[in-house]
From Swiss-Prot:
Its main location: membrane. This is Ion-translocating oxidoreductase complex subunit C. [4Fe-4S] cluster 1 binds at C377, C380, C383, C426. It is found in: Cell inner membrane. Gene3D superfamilies: 3.30.70.20, NADH-ubiquinone oxidoreductase 51kDa subunit.
Length: 708
């Protein structure tokens, strides 16, 4: 009974929810064998043809390359690309690639030499003697990636499976309309394909190997059954035709009844899936020693006069392939890379063929039908019924259109396989897949930005923590240094303490005066002088405080100073224009100048020490001060311009000038030390000073007249 149940379960086929049955349109291209396409003159090889980062360049402009020669190095998840033919590297520059927006990616441009020479090839026909790691590394370095459309590096996928893979599934469903690349490959290369499957099984050591193929490929089914006639380790499962049965999650459920968990991978349930084209590429890499330089591409559509499947070299321009298939474009011709449901329209035809290019569809106007205008959603739920991932496309549409990223994520938009079934059945002609692609791209960009922000925050916090640790370490070092001084510092501290103790001991000793000697009062005298100096400093401080309290009007002072300067300039000009016969006694002039300066200083000090209520006009004071200075300069100039016959003893003149300056200083000090109650009226003082200057001037003129 258990054996019967196991046999029943072994051949059981499950069915997934949703799905559609569009017109297959496969007979246009699957009836002719695979053929080679003549070499193009120029090849454009993008460095990134897979999921992951691009490899490191190992060629330069001007290098000669052979077919199969690595153009980049593959390290980690970086998959290398290889030269599709022999020729010369003419440029390494960005070039538009197979993308809906024709985004430019760094590419190696090779001009073919027409010889198509291979590099030396080293095949491993005895691959069973090689270790698992060696085989995975060879597959990776030979550039093998998933050829079913995802482009995930095969070596990385095999390495990630490890020892937990129980079921190896070979995806031969090829469910999308028009595409027949896998169908034709299975018809023409079934034996090589099975050999590649055995290499994968040798690496993974699964418990069972399943080939899932739709029942609309009878010739391919017959070829595989013929090759597997003597094999018991590989099971061929024929499944009903339904779109999208070729989806990874859908085919896994159809063949095993297991569902891949949300956000997980098929390896989490012990399943690993590979495409038939990938298995064939593994065989050529391991046994033949040939890196992946070409793949099968379907050329179909009513605008192509010679449809079929061809071996297309990677990097071949799409235009070259279409011209070889006798492309007859119409006025508004559209060319789709991929199928009609999951493919995208090419913006121009000079983009190159890459590893994930499986079909070039050039439909006519009759095939496409009239373009339908997008209308409002009528909430019919037809999209939800057709969704094979059990999602709610209607809700995802509203969330995507309203930029509600959180709600779209909550409704598992990441599980959308972009099969296009919802858009196919939508009566309002809403391009739902386009909305979902854009929403997923925006969510990915937001997460990438959040990741960068989190990394920046982590770096900032790490830096702050490091600075705090360094600061704490410095403080700890300073504390340690303060607590434990060095030997040199200890000696200095001990010497200072000894000196202090010695001084204290001397201070406590009694003063002894010997007979016949005078006591040493130098310390007492020095202390008394210090106290006097301190008292004088305090008195000066107090005087400065009192002076600051009595502030004159600064505007009046400035005006008086300006008037004084003007009068002084006038006197200097008069002195310069005076007649030579008016000679002045230089000694008397010097004495008078000193007296005038002393009076001027006395007047300024009296003005500064005046009470606040007795304000002096600063303009008058400044004018008088300037007049006094001008008279002093005039007398000094007269002394300098004296006639030679009236020579003056310089020593006497210097003595007299010094006496005059001393008297002036004495007068200033007396004014400064005057009692506060003996205040002088600044106006009276200014008048007296002016009278004194006038009398001095008159006396000087009278003396000159008498001498004449």
């Amino acid at each position: 009974m258990l054996k019967l149940f196991s046999a029943f379960r072994k051949n059981k086929i499950w069915d997934f929810n949703g799905g559609i049955h569009p017109p297959e349109m496969k007979t246009q291209s699957n009836g002719t064998p695979l053929r080679q396409v003549p070499l193009a003159q120029r090849f454009v090889i993008p460095l990134k043809q897979h999921i992951g980062a691009e490899g490191e360049l190992c060629v330069s402009v001007g290098d000669k390359v052979l077919r199969g020669q690595p153009l980049t190095r593959g390290r980690g998840k970086m998959l290398p690309v290889h030269a599709p033919t022999s020729g010369t590297v003419t440029a390494i520059a960005p070039h538009s690639t197979a993308h809906p927006s024709a985004l430019a990616e760094l590419s190696v441009i090779i001009d073919a030499d027409g010889e198509d020479c291979w590099i030396p090839r080293d095949g491993w026909a005895d691959y069973r003697t090689r270790s698992r790691e060696e085989l995975i590394e060879r597959i990776h370095q030979f550039g093998v990636a998933g050829l079913g459309g995802a482009g995930f590096p095969t070596g990385v996928k095999l390495q990630g499976g490890g020892d937990k893979i129980e079921t190896l599934i070979i995806n031969a469903a090829e469910c999308e309309p028009y595409i027949t690349a896998d169908d034709r490959l299975m018809q023409d290369c079934a034996a090589q394909l099975v050999e590649g499957i055995r290499i994968l099984a040798h690496i993974l050591q699964p418990r069972e190997i399943l080939i899932g193929i739709e029942d609309n490929k009878p010739q391919a089914i017959s070829m595989l059954r013929a090759v597997l006639a003597d094999s018991n380790d590989i099971s061929l499962r024929v499944i009903p035709t339904k779109y999208p049965s070729g989806g990874a999650k859908q085919l896994t459920y159809i063949l095993t009844g297991k569902q891949v968990p949300h956000g997980g991978r098929s390896s989490d349930i012990g399943v690993l899936m590979q495409n038939v084209g990938t298995a064939y590429a593994v065989k050529r890499a391991v046994i033949d020693g040939e890196p992946i330089t070409e793949r099968v591409v379907t050329l179909t559509g009513e605008a192509i006069a010679r449809p079929g499947n061809v071996w297309a070299r990677l990097g071949t321009p799409v235009r070259h392939l279409l011209n070889d298939a006798r492309f007859c474009p119409s006025a508004d011709q559209m060319v789709i890379m991929g199928g009609p449901l999951m493919g995208f329209t090419l913006p121009w035809l000079d983009v190159p063929v890459v590893k994930i290019t499986n079909c070039l569809l050039a439909p006519s106007a009759n095939e496409l039908g009239e373009p339908q205008e997008e209308q409002s959603c009528i909430r019919c739920s037809a999209c939800a019924d057709a969704c094979p991932a059990d999602l709610l496309p209607q809700q995802l549409y509203w969330f995507s259109k309203g930029q509600q990223h959180d709600k779209a994520t909550t409704h598992n938009i990441a599980d959308c396989i972009e099969c296009g079934a919802c858009a196919w059945v939508c009566p309002s002609n809403i391009p739902l897949v386009q909305y979902f692609r854009q929403e997923k791209a925006e969510i990915a960009a937001i997460r990438q930005e959040e990741k960068r922000a989190a990394e920046a925050k982590a770096r900032f916090e790490a830096r702050q923590a490091r600075l705090e640790r360094e600061k704490a370490a410095r403080l700890e070092r300073h504390k340690s240094a303060a607590v434990q001084p060095a030997a040199k510092d200890k000696d200095a501290i001990a010497a200072a303490l000894a000196r202090v103790k010695e001084k204290q001991a001397q201070a406590t000793q009694p003063i002894v005066i010997k007979a016949g000697e005078r006591p040493d009062n130098s310390a007492i005298i020095a202390a008394r002088e210090a106290r006097k100096a301190q008292a004088r400093a305090k008195q000066a401080e107090l005087q400065q405080t009192n002076d600051a309290a009595t502030v004159a009007d600064p505007r009046k002072t400035a005006v008086e100073a300006a008037i004084a300067r003007a009068k002084a300039r006038k006197l200097e000009q008069q002195q310069a224009n005076a007649e030579p016969e008016e000679q002045v006694d230089p000694r008397k002039a010097a004495i008078e100048a000193a007296i005038a300066r002393a009076k001027a200083r006395k007047l300024e000090q009296q003005q500064a020490n005046a009470e606040p209520e007795e304000q002096v006009d600063p303009r008058k004071a400044a004018v008088e001060a300037a007049i006094a200075r001008a008279k002093a300069r005039k007398l000094e100039q007269q002394q300098a311009n004296a006639v030679p016959e009236e020579q003056v003893d310089p020593r006497k003149a210097a003595v007299e000038a010094a006496i005059a300056r001393a008297k002036a200083r004495k007068l200033e000090q007396q004014q400064t030390n005057a009692e506060p109650e003996e205040q002088v009226d600044p106006r009276k003082a200014a008048v007296a000073a002016a009278i004194a200057r006038a009398q001095a001037k008159k006396a000087a003129q009278q003396k000159v007249v008498n001498e004449d």
